[in-house]
């Protein structure tokens, strides 16, 4: 089999040649500095895993583990007491749920293990993939620093967007593991395309692609774009194409066969429900992604040398997807923004160790160094998750986002499977401890009566709602407990105060 593919782009040819020579003193110092900086950043993330700060969707994933832990074969809806499928029941979460069931570990401890595994896969995946692009020993560390710090001057916290501050809050999410798998997938695919990979390897690649898509659909789109770019860059001989087709077919079959939810139903289930919340992805591009611009310049240089450069093609595919989302109003397509950002981040890191005159590489190094310093400063608030806020300088403390307070205070009364009437943030957190809510705290497109549940919940907490209406809602949904903030329900004779939590929260028992 003849495959015209080189694991290194022309821009990095000198890096490969230089690997066999003794490095110059400046290069050795630079490599040591990059490794030390990457090590410090990873140490910070490791310490964050121990604390596991909660600000966002952590409760959703904890609730998913609760259901899988108690009923691994038929978990039902993770948030409400209903027998519906859920896209949160991914292969990774099923595995973690089994771990929780076998070991008896608390779901938050399991999520700490998930965070550690996700970060490990992300770091090793970046290392492996970058080694397919450059043999320079400093390249992986520079690429990892770029991935974590080259975003914008304003931290942007969203799952699947692996900035340092974002990862500090989302390391336990399936998106982190999925992105790590994506990097491994691209590295494995690149090697399969240039080597004599057998049918078994290609079948495994197809299964891995399906697992990535099942674990986090948005990151799966990014992974798919990167895979297409890798195939385009390979200039593979015709004999390889049947194997690519088989891998794709195996992946589609695996997606179809997954028993916990219908993957293909997701394409029509959401409707326009995802678009309003995702419009924010397109806002403030300079503040959120501006530090990536030098990487775009590096991509242009790579593309001029090779029209099929994998990073350049990856970037262009990402631009097409994200741009189409903006033009069509499908703002959820903005979740593919990492397909735009990641190639630029890697391109800038590789430009520092690539081919060309020394002064050119020095220029790229200055750009990268300045951008990393700016990005590190922008995301310095992540230090607040391992250092007490009072010990931080004021300008750093101002960048810190305080995590949410947990709802462990309700657990002496609320048992597993109890239905709790809750709204707002409470509805996002209560299911993490085993309870159900009446209305889901997150959009659920497989729940047919979601709108009615939301309306019932809103009416229940209305100041002028008759007691008879509240009692009817309690009977209909089997409500045993109510969580509310303030004293709006204190005069209701059908409720009894049993506990008070932080920030004015009150737990009522239904009489």
Predicted regions mapped to residue ranges:
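Extracytoplasmic
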Residues: 4-7, 224, 380-511
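Active-site lumenal/periplasmic loops and adjacent helix-entry segments of GT-C-fold
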Residues: 25-172, 176-180, 217
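Membrane-interfacial loop-to-transmembrane alpha-helix junctions, especially the N-terminal start
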Residues: 31, 139-142, 198-201, 240-247, ...
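Transmembrane catalytic cores of multi-pass membrane glycosyltransferases
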Residues: 57, 208-313, 330-336
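Transmembrane alpha-helical segments
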Residues: 122-130, 169, 181-193, 225-232, ...
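Short hydrophobic alpha-helices at membrane interfaces in multi-pass membrane enzymes
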Residues: 189-210
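Hydrophobic/aromatic-rich transmembrane helices and adjacent perimembrane loops
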Residues: 222, 330-365
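Signature aromatic-anchored transmembrane alpha helix within multi-pass, membrane-resident enzymes
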Residues: 249, 355-382
């Amino acid at each position: 089999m003849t495959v015209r593919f080189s694991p290194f782009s022309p821009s990095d040819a000198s890096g490969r040649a230089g690997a066999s020579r003794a490095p110059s003193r400046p290069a050795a110092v630079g490599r040591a500095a990059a490794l030390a900086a990457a090590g410090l950043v990873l140490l910070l993330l490791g310490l964050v895993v121990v604390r596991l700060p909660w600000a966002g969707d952590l409760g959703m994933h904890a609730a998913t583990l609760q259901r899988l832990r108690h009923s691994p074969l038929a978990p039902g809806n993770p948030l409400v007491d209903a027998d519906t499928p859920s896209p949160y029941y991914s292969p990774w979460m099923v595995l973690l749920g089994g771990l929780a069931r076998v070991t008896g570990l608390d779901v938050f401890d399991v999520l700490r293990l998930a965070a550690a595994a996700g970060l490990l896969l992300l770091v090793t995946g970046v290392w492996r993939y970058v080694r397919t692009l450059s043999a320079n020993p400093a390249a992986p560390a520079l690429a990892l620093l770029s991935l974590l710090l080259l975003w914008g001057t304003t931290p942007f916290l969203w799952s699947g967007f692996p900035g340092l501050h974002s990862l500090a809050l989302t390391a336990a999410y399936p998106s982190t593991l999925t992105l790590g798998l994506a990097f491994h997938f691209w590295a494995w695919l690149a090697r399969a395309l240039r080597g004599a990979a057998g049918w078994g390897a290609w079948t495994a690649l197809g299964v891995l692609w399906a697992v990535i898509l099942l674990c986090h659909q948005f990151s799966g789109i990014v992974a798919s774009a990167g895979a297409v770019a890798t195939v385009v860059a390979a200039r593979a001989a015709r004999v390889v194409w049947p194997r690519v087709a088989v891998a794709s077919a195996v992946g589609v079959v695996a997606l179809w066969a997954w028993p916990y939810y219908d993957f293909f139903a997701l394409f029509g289930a959401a409707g326009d429900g995802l678009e309003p919340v995702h419009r924010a992805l397109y806002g403030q591009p300079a503040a959120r992604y501006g530090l990536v611009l030098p990487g775009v310049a590096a991509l242009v240089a790579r593309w001029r040398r090779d029209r099929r450069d994998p990073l350049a093609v990856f970037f262009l595919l990402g631009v097409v997807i994200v741009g189409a989302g903006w033009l069509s109003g499908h703002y959820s397509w903005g979740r593919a923004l990492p397909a735009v950002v990641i190639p630029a981040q890697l391109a800038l890191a590789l430009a520092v160790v690539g081919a060309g005159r020394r002064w050119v590489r020095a220029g790229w190094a200055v750009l990268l160094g300045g951008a990393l310093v700016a990005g590190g400063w922008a995301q310095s608030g992540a230090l607040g998750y391992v250092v007490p806020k009072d010990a931080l300088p004021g300008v750093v403390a101002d960048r810190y986002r305080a995590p949410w307070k947990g709802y462990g205070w309700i657990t002496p009364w609320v048992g597993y499977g109890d239905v709790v009437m809750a709204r707002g943030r409470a509805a996002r957190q209560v299911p993490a401890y085993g309870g159900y809510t009446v209305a889901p705290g997150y959009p659920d497109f497989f729940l047919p009566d979601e709108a009615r549940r939301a309306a019932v919940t809103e009416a229940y907490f209305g100041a002028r709602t008759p007691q008879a209406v509240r009692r009817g809602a309690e009977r209909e949904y089997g409500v045993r407990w109510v969580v509310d903030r303030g004293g709006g329900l204190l005069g209701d004779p059908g409720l009894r105060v049993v506990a008070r939590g932080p920030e004015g929260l009150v737990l009522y028992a239904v009489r």
